[in-house]
């Protein structure tokens, strides 16, 4: 394997000059630069990433801590982040935590040893243990995505789940629905609470009662939508519409409704949340709340790149607002 000394010898220059050409740390005459680059090409020389990182104080790598990469919502965001990192010449270290504080600690320790240039954090919930762990890495440029907490040491991208819950519920009300159920996430989790509070505000503004028997909690999985919807369907009185707090729970709810011989939206309307790629292919195509996954990912990684290059600047909060996507799963009464 060729070394930097081999390149210097072939190009007729010093190893210091070769280093300056590779790292672009000092002006080198064009002719000399071409000689070095040609020698690198001829010898198929690949500079040591570790050695380069020590000299220029960068590893061209980003760490990303996520709850999981399996759900469609997270997967779409991760894809946009990875794509932009690739275009910018950065490697992405993706770490799944399942919200386990021990895993978070181990992943953070590993990323610190890798000397990543910055960190993206996107977890479904932030326990106090998790927050304490993140606080110990305050010197590392960090952007917290989606529903994370804000502190003076991090930048934050906010997704406005409260607004999304309000928009979804108001759309049902504007279409004549008064008897509205909600299939939420766990109401001890931030994102579920915010979407529920948006639902609650819209119902209160319209002077509509919230039936406690129609408030269901799941874990944002299709099985939860299915099981929660079945619990609603065995009741004497049925809602005319259901707000499912993510699209995959809406898929489960639609399946349960169909198994009972009922139709969406003829018998029960369904609105989802997230606008995952598959939602337009549901039967019927799902009316939902659009939260741009690609925009969230792009905003986050661009903010992190900015933080890496401008470490002394004041930290920022960037808000992304959800939008209604109307398809065919809600009926006008």
Curated annotation (Swiss-Prot):
GO terms for molecular function: DNA-binding transcription factor activity; transcription cis-regulatory region binding. InterPro entries: HTH_LacI, LacI/GalR-like_sensor, Lambda_DNA-bd_dom_sf, Peripla_BP_I, Tscrpt_reg_HTH_PurR. Hypoxanthine binds at residues 73, 189, 191, 220, 274. Pfam families: LacI, Peripla_BP_3. Consists of two structural and functional domains: an N-terminal DNA-binding domain, approximately the first 60 residues, and a larger C-terminal domain, approximately 280 residues, which imparts the function of corepressor binding and oligomerization. HAMAP family: HTH_type_PurR. Homodimer. This is HTH-type transcriptional repressor PurR.
